[in-house]
Design a protein with these regions (language model features):
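N-terminal secretory signal peptides that target proteins for export/translocation
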Residues: 1-7
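A phosphate-binding catalytic loop at a beta-strand-loop-alpha-helix junction
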Residues: 119-130
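Cys-dependent protein tyrosine phosphatase-like superfamily
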Residues: 24-119, 134-179
């Protein structure tokens, strides 16, 4: 019985891999999942695919900060592909269930060090990226909270915060602590 279950699991995983490969090959190079432009030097987005690197080059991005954890199926060659294209790349693996103030502090350091470099902050779905960017804008750049929240809520919703309460708690904690 367990052999049949194992075979079914392997078939399912193979189908998922094939589906992801087809999606990646057919992806529109100009459409990045959950992309949101905040201003001329800062944008956030979901997962990048290799076909998106040309768009990053055309739009003169100079730095990509990836807040997703390493995932063989989603971002195995991402750092190589982006740096090979001449774009600086930093990965801060923020664990979805347990974002920390240390993660945020490292992100703030990277954002402070970027200067005026055109930057894309991303993760798998733009939840981590938009939340961290919101906190940076409010706590470090002095952007009015309502303005920064409006950008974050282009990605998040009240339902998402209900579904992922650890993120509302994390954001509240960061705001109270001033990160």
């Amino acid at each position: 019985m367990s052999s049949k279950i194992g075979q079914q699991i392997m078939r399912f995983l193979l189908l998922c891999f094939i589906a992801f490969s087809v999606i990646a090959e057919d992806a529109d190079p100009d459409v990045i999942y959950n992309y949101h432009k905040i201003n001329d030097t800062l944008s956030t987005a979901g997962q990048l695919l290799p076909v998106h690197v040309a768009k990053l080059q055309r739009e003169n991005f100079q730095l990509v900060i990836n807040l997703a954890v390493a995932d063989k199926a989603r971002n195995l060659d991402e750092s190589y592909t982006i740096t090979h294209a001449g774009i600086n790349y930093v990965q801060i693996p923020v664990v979805w269930d347990t974002p920390t103030l240390d993660d945020l502090d490292l992100f703030f350091s990277m954002m402070d060090a970027r200067g005026e470099r055109k930057t894309l902050v991303h993760c798998f779905a733009n939840y981590r990226a938009s939340a961290f960017t919101y906190l940076y804008r409010v706590l470090k750049e002095g952007v009015p909270e309502a303005d920064a929240r409006k950008d974050m809520m282009q990605i998040w919703s009240d339902d998402a915060f209900t579904k992922y309460p650890q993120w509302r708690a994390f954001i509240d904690k960061a705001l109270v602590n001033g990160a």
